[in-house]
Structure formats: C-alpha cells, structure tokens
C-alpha cells in the first residue's frame, strides 16, 4: 500500500471517531484552512468569534465555546504557516458527563489539498469535506450481454455495484422452414437489434455522467457467446464510451455473479486495480495457511511480535478492525496495565476502573490509541508493506470474520 493509501485509511478512522462525538449544545468548533491561506487572518476571525461567544446566554455553553476557541488559537500558534495540503481543526468538549469539561483538539493535515475555508460552531463536527476525499472516485463500467438479458454495473474501489438488470423479448430459434422461417428470423433480428439499442441507451445514462466527472476509467464487456462482440461491433454504445472499452471477455454467468466473474476474468486488464490485488493477497494468505508453510501469522499479539522482530513482509489489516490499545497507570504507586480491546469494551473498562487494584488509590490516568495506526507505523519503519483489506469482497469478509481482520505474511519462519 502506498503512503497515501495509509494516510487515507488513517483519515477514515479519524473521521469515524469525529462523527461519533455529540455536543450538548452548539459548542463544537470545526475549522477548515486551505493550503497557503494566511494563518493571521484565521487567528483574527477566531478572536472575533471569541468576542461574539461571550454573549451566549447559557453559562455552560458559553464556557465550552470559549474554551474551544482558546484551544484552537493555542494550537494554531504551533504552525509557522499552513501545512502544504491545508489544515482541519476540530475542537470541543467531548465529555459525556454533564458539568464536566474535557476540551480536546483534533488536528488533521489531509492527504489531499483542502479547497474549502470554513468555520462552524455546531452540535456536531463538520466532516463532509474530509468524507469527500475518502470517496473512491475512479470507476470502471461493467456490462454483461446475452441474447435475452444484460446487466450493467460499476466497479468502484473494491465494490461491485449492480446498477440494472435488463431482459428482452427476443424469441428463440424456430424449426419452421420457407418464408415463415425467414420472416420469423427477421423479427428475431429486429428484436435483438432493439434490445442492443436499449442496453446502449441504459449504459449511456449510467456511464456518461461518470465520464463528464472524469471518474470513468474504462469499460469491460463480457458474455457467454458472440452477442457481446455483436454489441461492440454494432456500435450500440455512445461513441465517447466506445473509446473507453478496455476489453471484451468470455464469461459463463449473468447478473451479479456475471459481474464478479467479469472482474475476475479481466484481471489482466485490471492488474493494478485494488479489487484484483486484494483478492490475490487474501488468496496468498489462505494458500500459506492450507499448506502450513509457517510464513503467516494472525492475531494482534502474534502480528505485533512479528513486526517487532522485523519478520513481516506484508501486514494485512481489515478496514473493519477497530481495536484500541489501553494503558492504565496509577499515579500513586506506579501500577500499570496494558490491554487491547474494542471501543465498546474501553468505555466499560473506564467505568469499572474506580481504584488501583494494588494501593486502592483513585488517582489513575487512562490513555488509549488506535492499534491499526500503531501497527502501520511499526510496519512502515520496518520496511514492511501494508495492505488494507476491505469488507466489500467475499474474501475480505472471510478474512475479517475468520481471522479477526489482522494477519501478516512473513519474510521467514519464526521459531
């Protein structure tokens, strides 16, 4: 996975975290600063907002908004200039206990340049500009064609989406002879022609808007017989879409299974595409597992150990993996505990950890961090590749459910 892909994965995790936060009132500050924008102007705006916020009637809301603006201005002083791709700041009281203030700053330097300048104080953080960066824009058009049916779909990222199933009234062949047979054949050819036209029209309505947005990277057409070639050679597709045909492939199925087979059979065409690459990686992992080569490991503890030994060639992480690393420390006696758990388990852990089990002191600090981000950093420092496995494919689902969404392909066997 490229450095940018790793950044996108981490951005997705941060956006998910931000979207879960809710303010008790209009008190969460979102600030988007485009690349090269003058930070002095931003500071001036925040000072003006600070003055306005002093008029908020609710004492609690006023305190939280003023606190958020103060923290935002303090954080901006850390930057001599706006980062190369811009800066997104999210500041506010994240405490779920009424009357308790826990104002936190979430600073994100995005992997792509920000083109929006925004300040908003609301009950939720504004994440839409970052979510737009996460949207997979590159798309491939998929068409399966038979005499009596066709399916139009889109491959975007690793997800295959069925857009439309079409059926025709093309009659089957007849055994009648003479003029009846010729007349019947003409009717059959006309029906087939009309059906092909309809496929082309529906494909245009789906793919031309993608082409206009420069998102359509190509079209792949498949089918079990000669109909697919007739469709291509008959120029039923819009002329701009015909230029985007990457290949015509023989397949056995139709419908959703046909689209999956089309992507599989067109792997040479889509060699660099994520769906094909991901499928091959997971299959490689399963192959090592079945053959018991000793060149794989899975589970957070085992993968962490392999990473620390520098034995990992490829780190495989499911996008559904949501574990956090938690460290509890008694500031009185030094007792310490380190655990890995889910976000839901963390909330319960905090609630139940009322006193130190060693000295009974209540002076305990608890910190947490994202396991996936931590392991990605260790992997990159050790020269290992990192691959994020989506949940959009059967292989991705199987990897997540059967192996917990974390595994590694190793450079050498571990003792």
From Swiss-Prot:
Keyword annotations of the record: Cytoplasm, Protein biosynthesis
Summary of the function given for this chain in its UniProt record: Directs the termination of nascent peptide synthesis (translation) in response to the termination codons UAA, UAG and UGA.
Coiled coil: none
Subcellular location: Cytoplasm
SUPFAM superfamilies associated with the record: L30e-like, N-terminal domain of eukaryotic peptide chain release factor subunit 1, ERF1, Translational machinery components
Gene Ontology cellular component terms for the protein in this record: cytoplasm
Organism domain of life: Archaea
SMART domains the record matches: eRF1_1
Family: Belongs to the eukaryotic release factor 1 family.
Keyword Protein biosynthesis included in the entry's annotation: yes
GO MF annotation: an example: translation release factor activity, codon specific
The protein's name in its UniProt record: Peptide chain release factor subunit 1
Subunit structure and binding partners: Heterodimer of two subunits, one of which binds GTP.
Species annotation: Thermococcus sibiricus (strain DSM 12597 / MM 739)
């Amino acid at each position: 996975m490229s450095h940018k892909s790793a950044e996108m994965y981490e951005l997705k995790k941060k956006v998910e975290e931000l979207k879960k936060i809710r303010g008790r009132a209009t008190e969460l500050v979102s600030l988007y600063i485009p690349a090269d924008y003058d930070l002095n102007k931003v500071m001036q705006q925040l000072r003006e907002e600070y003055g306005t916020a002093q008029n908020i009637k609710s004492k609690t809301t006023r305190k939280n908004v003023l606190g958020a603006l103060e923290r935002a201005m303090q954080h901006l002083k850390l930057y001599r200039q706006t980062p190369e791709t811009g800066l997104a700041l999210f500041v506010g009281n994240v405490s779920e206990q009424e009357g308790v203030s826990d104002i936190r700053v979430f600073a994100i330097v995005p992997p792509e340049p920000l083109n929006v300048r925004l300040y908003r104080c609301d009950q939720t953080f504004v994440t839409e500009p970052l979510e737009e960066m996460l949207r997979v824009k590159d798309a491939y058009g998929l068409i399966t064609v038979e005499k009596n049916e066709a399916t139009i779909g889109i491959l975007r990222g690793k997800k295959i989406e069925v857009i439309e199933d079409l059926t025709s009234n093309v009659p089957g062949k007849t055994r009648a002879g003479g003029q009846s047979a010729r007349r019947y054949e003409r009717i059959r050819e006309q029906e087939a022609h009309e059906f092909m036209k309809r496929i082309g029209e529906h494909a245009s309505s789906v793919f031309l808007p993608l082409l206009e947005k420069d998102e359509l990277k190509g079209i792949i057409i498949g089918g079990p017989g000669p109909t697919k070639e007739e469709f291509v050679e008959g120029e039923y597709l819009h002329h701009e879409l015909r230029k985007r045909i990457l290949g015509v492939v023989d397949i056995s199925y139709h419908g959703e299974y046909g689209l999956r087979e089309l992507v599989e059979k067109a792997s040479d065409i889509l060699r660099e595409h994520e769906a094909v690459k991901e499928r091959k990686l997971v299959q490689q992992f399963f192959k090592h597992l079945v053959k018991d080569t000793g060149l794989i490991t899975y589970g957070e503890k085992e993968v962490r150990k392999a990473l620390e030994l520098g034995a990992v060639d490829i780190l495989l992480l499911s996008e559904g993996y949501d574990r956090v690393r938690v460290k509890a420390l008694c500031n009185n006696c030094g007792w310490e505990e380190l655990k890995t758990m889910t976000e839901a388990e963390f909330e319960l852990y905090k609630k139940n950890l009322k006193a130190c089990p060693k000295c009974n002191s209540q002076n305990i600090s608890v910190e947490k961090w994202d396991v996936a981000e931590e392991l990605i950093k260790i992997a990159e420092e050790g020269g290992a590749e990192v691959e994020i496995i989506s949940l959009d494919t059967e292989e991705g689902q199987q990897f997540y459910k059967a192996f917990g969404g974390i595994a590694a392909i190793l450079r050498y066997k571990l003792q």
